[in-house]
Amino acid sequence: MGAMRIATLTSGGDCPGLNAVIRGIVRTASNEFGSTVVGYQDGWEGLLADRRVQLYDDEDIDRILLRGGTILGTGRLHPDKFRAGIDQVKANLADAGIDALIPIGGEGTLKGAKWLADNGIPVVGVPKTIDNDVNGTDFTFGFDSAVSVATDAIDRLHTTAESHNRVMIVEVMGRHVGWIALHAGMAGGAHYTVIPEVPFDISEICKRMERRFQMGEKYGIIVVAEGALPKEGTMELREGEVDQFGHKTFTGIGQQIADEVHRRLGHDVRTTVLGHIQRGGTPTAFDRVLATRYGVRAARACHEGQFNTVVALKGERIRMISFDEAVGTLKKVPMERWVTAQAMFG
């Protein structure tokens, strides 16, 4: 295809690397094909409201490689509101002369992108999530940065926990999958890690911590994914709230585990919830490179007519996969990875 007018947007939670994708799209579209790129602001809401800006291949675009967050802004939109606005979306894209749309986001965003593709809009999706739970791709950008933040926090908590003879609970993001907890726990030398894929036994956690204290190691580090749940009947949880999209909020599982460990063992137990700090800041070198490669490949896919696809990392190569492969199921931590992590507990 010749020169095109491409639109892009960022939707869902922010993460390091979004700007690197935008930069990759703009520079590739402009330099290789003479195309122009438009950015819709604040995700799907901006597309529905026709809030758009022209993105130029200039010094401003060049500088965003280092920046966290997204220059376009982001947001979440209820699927029902989005689907009800399909006619408006089509009209806005037509009025702006858009030939292709590149949505950048996680599972929910990619489901929305698939729905647009099913309704005749030329779409190329770019997977984004710090959780690393998008199926069909080995890694999503933002994950490495989040793991680095969590690992740094664990490194720092080792010294304060040891100084005060404490058990430290570190709660990290991961509503349905435990990739951040698993990787940060291994990299940070945690003494136990709890992930959503494997229901935990509070008695086993307490046993591990008590064994450490008996052996003279007067502190412990436990990493907990926010979506972790206990084995049925082993621990009673306090109910979480439900957000505007019907999702139960899991923040607080770390404190609940801390309370139970303290009740059973009597040790001083403190909780650190990393929360949104995992989303912020400068992307790691790995995420900058991966996000740039995603942006370049997405722009090229548009000009090659490879629509209704998603860019993905397979081994060392960036490939195009179907929306069905990307959004069919979540990519969860395999049991063999969990077994490997267990060998480091204690």
Swiss-Prot record:
Record's GO cellular component terms: 6-phosphofructokinase complex
Protein's UniProt name: ATP-dependent 6-phosphofructokinase
Binding site for substrate: 129-131, 166, 173-175, 226, 270, 276-279
PANTHER family: ATP-DEPENDENT 6-PHOSPHOFRUCTOKINASE 3, PHOSPHOFRUCTOKINASE
Annotated positions binding ATP: 13, 76-77, 106-109
Binding site for Mg(2+): 107
Entry-linked Pfam families: PFK (PF00365)
NCBIfam families xref list: PFK_mixed (TIGR02483), PRK03202.1 (NF002872)
Catalytic machinery residues: 131
Lineage top rank: taxon: Bacteria
UniProt cross-references to PROSITE patterns, sorted A to Z: PHOSPHOFRUCTOKINASE
Phylogenetic classification of the source organism: Bacteria, Bacillati, Actinomycetota, Actinomycetes, Mycobacteriales
Residue numbers marked as site, Important for substrate specificity: 108
Record carries keyword ATP-binding: yes
HAMAP family the UniProt entry points to: Phosphofructokinase_III
Subcellular location: Cytoplasm
Associated pathway: Carbohydrate degradation; glycolysis; D-glyceraldehyde 3-phosphate and glycerone phosphate from D-glucose: step 3/4
Keywords: ATP-binding, Cytoplasm, Glycolysis, Kinase, Magnesium, Metal-binding, Nucleotide-binding, Transferase
One of the record's GO molecular function terms: diphosphate-fructose-6-phosphate 1-phosphotransferase activity
